[in-house]
């Protein structure tokens, strides 16, 4: 057997044993498109994830510095899930969920299942019970850092509790993983960044809760703040950069950039202008942006305002981008042309004649 055949045999055996997407070539564009996904609500992020959204039946970790947009990303995923008719749960260990902001992002807060647990054990047990029920499509846990072990809560303030949280996470994830796969539920953990003490070389940053989540997560997203967005003198938002640092269902290390506007969420219009200009769906000449030969604005801010007011053109641009960048999810459906009446009558006569011949 040649090396190529032996390798192909091994790859097919691995896929059969561990599932599609468990192994691939890094430059392979044909990723596992048949994996069920929940869209992120951000086109650039759906493209970076490689399969058009977050994979169901998997664990996702989103981590970053404070106010970098981690919770916003999870709420957008919940909104997309609910639009598809799914059921979502939010385990608010930080006790900081803002219903008004969630509603602004498109979340149906009346039907969102929310829990504010007292201990880390309680939070993870609730998550496991929801997953095992099979009736939940997405569970968000905000955040790993707030999953305080019961022993730490009941102990005194100065007591040492080395490794308790890491042990708790390790036990919970061992239990959760099989149930998540079986019920095809998407479980998203929000995590925070801490600094390692005494690191002279390399990256001193790490995430809380030990190493278990790093191993069990199929996708890990690193969220960072970019530059500020100004409305005159005032800062109205900031740029967000998301890096896919781990991806088991598509090639990793891709990046997505978009704008987060304070009090509004992710700016769809800014994303459409940036991606539209990049892929020549929108023409850019100097400071002017044009669509189908018609000028839509001078500068990005004016163009954003135009798209906000003209939703029909905005939807057209969005559809064109989705079909271009995610053809496996948003393929252009060819319309089946109806047969002319003369052909229909001829085929009908032929079928009737064939039936009569069979009877004879």
Swiss-Prot record:
Residues 333-360 are annotated as: Disordered. One of its GO terms (molecular function) is single-stranded DNA binding. It is found in: Cytoplasm. ATP binds at residues 64-71. It comes from the Bacteria. Pfam families: RecA, RecA_C. InterPro entries: AAA+_ATPase, DNA_recomb/repair_RecA, DNA_recomb/repair_RecA_CS, P-loop_NTPase, RecA-like_C, RecA-like_N, RecA_ATP-bd, RecA_C_sf. GO terms for biological process: DNA recombination; DNA repair; SOS response. Its main location: cytoplasm. Keywords: ATP-binding, Cytoplasm, DNA damage, DNA recombination, DNA repair, DNA-binding, Nucleotide-binding, SOS response. GO terms for cellular component: cytosol. CDD domains: RecA. NCBIfam families: tigrfam_recA. Can catalyze the hydrolysis of ATP in the presence of single-stranded DNA, the ATP-dependent uptake of single-stranded DNA by duplex DNA, and the ATP-dependent hybridization of homologous single-stranded DNAs. It interacts with LexA causing its activation and leading to its autocatalytic cleavage. Belongs to the RecA family. This is Protein RecA.
């Amino acid at each position: 057997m040649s090396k190529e055949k032996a390798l192909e045999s091994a790859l097919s055996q691995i896929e059969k044993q561990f599932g599609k997407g468990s192994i691939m070539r890094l430059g392979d564009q044909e990723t596992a498109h048949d994996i069920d996904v929940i869209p992120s609500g951000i086109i650039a992020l759906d493209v970076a994830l490689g399969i058009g959204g977050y994979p169901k039946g998997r664990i996702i970790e989103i981590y970053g510095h404070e106010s970098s947009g981690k919770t916003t990303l999870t709420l957008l995923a919940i909104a997309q899930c609910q639009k598809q008719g799914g059921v979502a749960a939010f385990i608010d260990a930080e006790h900081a969920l803002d219903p008004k902001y969630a509603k602004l992002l498109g979340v149906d807060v009346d039907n969102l299942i929310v829990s504010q647990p007292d201990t880390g054990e309680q939070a993870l047990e609730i998550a496991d019970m929801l997953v095992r029920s099979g009736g939940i499509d997405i569970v968000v846990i905000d955040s790993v850092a707030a999953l305080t072990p019961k022993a730490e809560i009941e102990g005194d303030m100065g007591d040492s509790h080395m490794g308790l949280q890491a042990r708790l996470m390790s036990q919970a994830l061992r239990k959760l993983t099989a149930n998540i796969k079986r019920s095809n539920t998407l479980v998203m953990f929000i995590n925070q960044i801490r600094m390692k003490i005494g690191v002279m070389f390399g990256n001193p940053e790490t995430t809380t809760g030990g190493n278990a989540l790093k191993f069990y997560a199929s996708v890990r997203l690193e969220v960072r703040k970019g530059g500020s967005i100004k409305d005159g003198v005032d800062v109205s938002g900031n740029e967000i950069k998301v890096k896919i640092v781990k991806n088991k269902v598509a090639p990793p290390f891709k990046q997505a950039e978009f704008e987060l506007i304070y009090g509004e969420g992710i700016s769809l219009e800014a994303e459409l202008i940036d991606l539209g200009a990049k892929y020549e769906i929108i023409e850019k000449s100097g400071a002017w942006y044009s669509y189908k030969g018609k000028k839509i604005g001078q500068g990005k801010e004016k163009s954003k305002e135009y798209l906000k007011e003209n939703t029909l053109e905005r939807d057209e641009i969005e559809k064109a981008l989705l079909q271009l960048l995610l053809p496996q999810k948003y393929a252009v459906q060819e319309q089946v042309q109806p047969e002319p009446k003369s052909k229909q009558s001829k085929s009908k006569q032929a079928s009737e004649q064939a039936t009569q011949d069979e009877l004879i």
